[in-house]
Amino acid sequence: MKMMVVFLFSILLVFGFVAFASKPSPVYGGLSLVVSGGLGCAIVVSLEDVFLGLIVFLIYLGGMLVVFGYTAAMATEEYPESWVGNTVALSMLLFTVIVESAWYLMSGEVKVSMDIELFDIIGGYCVGQDYSGVSLLYGCGGWALVLLGWILFITIYVVLEVVRGCN
């Protein structure tokens, strides 16, 4: 059941990136990136790495909030173009269906294998990778967390100054 969920999230992730690549309007492009980021983190969480999925989701959405605010402010349209009349998205959907059908016909089955080790043996104790990631993030990786937070702060400040200068 878990692999079916991962497979479904993966297909939706590809459709989210196709929706971004067809980019009918910057507002919809930012929305599709946020949805794709959420689906990517859902894949990580469904593979039992909850902390990594949460951290990536928060950091990614922090960056996407900046980008989404910038694109929405700089390219405001009264009637934004939608995905309905876009030939890029429809041709990508057709290409995806053809590739998936060819893969199924050539292999005879759709099989997804996964070899992920969930536990590390450290000193005779079983320590989950999820919990060791927490200690590494706040231990040796604390400088990276502070640096990323500072970069996001500077970026939002620059975006707000650019948007303020346009009026």
Curated annotation (Swiss-Prot):
The lineage of its organism: Eukaryota, Metazoa, Chordata, Craniata, Vertebrata. The chain crosses the membrane at residues 1-21, 27-47, 50-70, 88-108, 143-163. It is found in: Mitochondrion inner membrane. Pfam families: Oxidored_q3 (PF00499). GO terms for cellular component: mitochondrial inner membrane. It is a multi-pass membrane protein. Core subunit of the mitochondrial membrane respiratory chain NADH dehydrogenase (Complex I) which catalyzes electron transfer from NADH through the respiratory chain, using ubiquinone as an electron acceptor. Essential for the catalytic activity and assembly of complex I. It catalyses: a ubiquinone + NADH + 5 H(+)(in) = a ubiquinol + NAD(+) + 4 H(+)(out). Belongs to the complex I subunit 6 family. Core subunit of respiratory chain NADH dehydrogenase (Complex I) which is composed of 45 different subunits. It comes from the Eukaryota. Its EC number is 7.1.1.2. Keywords: Electron transport, Membrane, Mitochondrion, Mitochondrion inner membrane, NAD, Respiratory chain, Translocase, Transmembrane, Transmembrane helix, Transport, Ubiquinone. GO terms for molecular function: NADH dehydrogenase (ubiquinone) activity. InterPro entries: ComplexI_Subunit6, NADH_UbQ/plastoQ_OxRdtase_su6, Nuo/plastoQ_OxRdtase_6_NuoJ. GO terms for biological process: mitochondrial electron transport, NADH to ubiquinone; mitochondrial respiratory chain complex I assembly. PANTHER family: NADH UBIQUINONE OXIDOREDUCTASE SUBUNIT ND6, NADH-UBIQUINONE OXIDOREDUCTASE CHAIN 6. This is NADH-ubiquinone oxidoreductase chain 6.
